[in-house]
């Protein structure tokens, strides 16, 4: 039987670990919400650090308790335990037990492990993920690759064989990892695997080849768009991020193709060419609400107009038939509330009036991003702005890599302190090269 002081101490450890797990989940929700400045998440990072420091004071006893919580049904407690055992590193007792538990975890707990391990890895903590990368379980392999992106001791060459794995999810995760680690010497090998030797071209992997500077992918994307068939969204995104003015007719054509219309509208926002604005305004006349919202989102991405509207959404809940008067069997969906929320304006007339009044100030650049010329300097500026959405920051980060040929990772959901360091590196780089690239809107992979 535990002494009262031991029970109290274990209770404190549980509270610290559960709090870490809760805060990890909360910070993820904040990043996805869009209404909280991303820099404010630093406060949650500080609270996680405080709980972590308290656990480190607990030494082996705290670690032992974290190992025990790997079997917990409490998701927050499990998430916190995984994070703590990852943070202490491979040489510490408890880390190996966590890795072993990860390899045997059931599918519905994989996300919890991945979330905790990614956050630890994003802070440059060493995680013994090598053994997991040898797993035969595709789901586990995919999760391990997502974590390994941030593990400095996992080299791109190490995961190259997984680019030919039987599972498409594993292949995609492996190619993404290699691209985001900036392993440009591996590009010819990846081009052969993705474009030549595969039974069919995986457009998602093709996009990651673009991130590594592949011109062959651009040729394939242009050919796919010219065929006029159903166009995979990733082909359009390849052209959008490469940003060549010569590709403008392909976007116009894709918007007019019903089979590729939605993907084309989304890609138009990334492409950002000012001549697409009237086409996007015309798309707001669509009967389909999702199509109108997609077109409006693209318009906002280009112009930064800030036009909004109030919309309503019905919330429904499923209740057992026994709880509903007049029903006898099966589940019944009952609308229990209607929520009003603010979203980007989808009214064609308002956008047309705004564009007519503001068209004259959009002559300084062919491409625009949130109302500013789409230069690399603007991308970096928006990357640092506290009010920038996670969607905008991810978009700008990717295009910075594609158009500059640099590989400075800035994970949109990583520790805020690490993000600020990465942004600082981008700012320093731009300060050195801006005289050369200030007026270059079509730079691709540092080669023009």
Where do the protein language model's features map onto the residues?
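N-terminal alpha-helical scaffold/docking segments in eukaryotic complex subunits
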Residues: 1-111, 115-126, 135-141, 145-155, ...
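Amphipathic alpha-helical scaffolding segments comprising HEAT/armadillo-like alpha-solenoid repeats
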Residues: 59-70, 90-103, 122-134, 152-164, ...
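Residue-level detector of extended alpha-helical repeat arrays and alpha-solenoid scaffolds
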Residues: 78, 110-113, 141, 171, ...
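Hydrophobic core positions within HEAT/HEAT-like alpha-solenoid repeats
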Residues: 82, 113-114, 130, 142-145, ...
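Structural signature of alpha-helical solenoid repeat scaffolds
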Residues: 86, 118, 149, 179, ...
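Amphipathic alpha-helical blocks and their helix-capping loop/short-beta junctions
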Residues: 308-365
């Amino acid at each position: 039987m535990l002494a009262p002081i031991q029970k109290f101490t274990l209770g404190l450890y549980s509270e610290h670990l559960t709090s870490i797990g809760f805060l990890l989940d909360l910070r993820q929700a904040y990043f996805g919400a869009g209404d909280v400045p991303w820099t404010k998440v630093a406060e949650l990072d500080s609270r996680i650090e405080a709980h972590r420091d308290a656990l480190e004071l607990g030494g082996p006893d705290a670690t032992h308790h974290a190992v025990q919580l790997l079997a917990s049904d409490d998701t927050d407690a499990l998430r916190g335990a995984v994070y703590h055992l990852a943070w202490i590193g491979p040489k510490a007792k408890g880390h190996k037990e966590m890795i072993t538990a990860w390899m045997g975890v059931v599918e519905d707990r994989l996300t919890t492990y991945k979330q905790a391990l990614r956050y630890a890895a994003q802070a440059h903590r060493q995680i013994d993920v090598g053994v997991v990368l040898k797993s035969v379980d595709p789901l586990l392999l995919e999760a391990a690759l997502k974590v390994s992106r941030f593990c400095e001791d996992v080299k791109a060459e190490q995961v190259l064989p997984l680019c030919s794995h039987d599972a498409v999810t594993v292949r995609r995760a492996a190619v993404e990892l290699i691209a985001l680690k900036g392993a440009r010497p591996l590009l010819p090998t990846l081009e052969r695997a993705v474009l030549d030797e595969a039974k069919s071209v995986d457009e998602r992997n093709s996009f990651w080849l673009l991130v590594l500077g592949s011109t062959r992918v651009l040729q394939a994307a242009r050919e796919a768009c010219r065929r006029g068939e159903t166009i995979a969204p990733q082909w359009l995104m390849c052209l959008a991020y490469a940003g060549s003015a010569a590709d403008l007719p392909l976007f116009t054509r894709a918007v007019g193709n019903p089979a590729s219309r939605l993907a084309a509208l989304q890609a138009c926002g990334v492409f950002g060419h000012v001549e697409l604005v009237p086409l996007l305004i015309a798309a707001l006349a669509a009967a389909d609400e999702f199509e109108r919202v997609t077109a409006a989102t693209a318009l906002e991405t280009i112009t930064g107009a800030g036009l909004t509207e109030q919309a309503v959404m019905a919330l429904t809940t499923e209740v057992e038939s026994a709880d509903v008067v007049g029903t006898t069997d099966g589940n019944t969906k009952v609308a229990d509330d209607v929520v009003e929320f603010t979203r980007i304006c989808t009214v064609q007339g308002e956008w047309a009036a705004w564009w007519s009044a503001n068209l004259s100030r959009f002559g300084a650049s062919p491409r625009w991003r949130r109302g500013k010329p789409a230069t690399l300097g603007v991308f970096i500026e928006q990357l640092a702005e506290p009010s920038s959405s996670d969607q905008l920051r991810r978009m700008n980060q990717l295009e910075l890599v594609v158009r500059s040929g640099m590989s400075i990772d800035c994970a949109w959901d990583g520790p805020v302190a690490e993000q600020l360091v990465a942004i600082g590196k981008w700012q320093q780089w731009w300060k050195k090269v801006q005289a050369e690239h200030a007026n270059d809107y079509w730079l691709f992979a540092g080669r023009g």
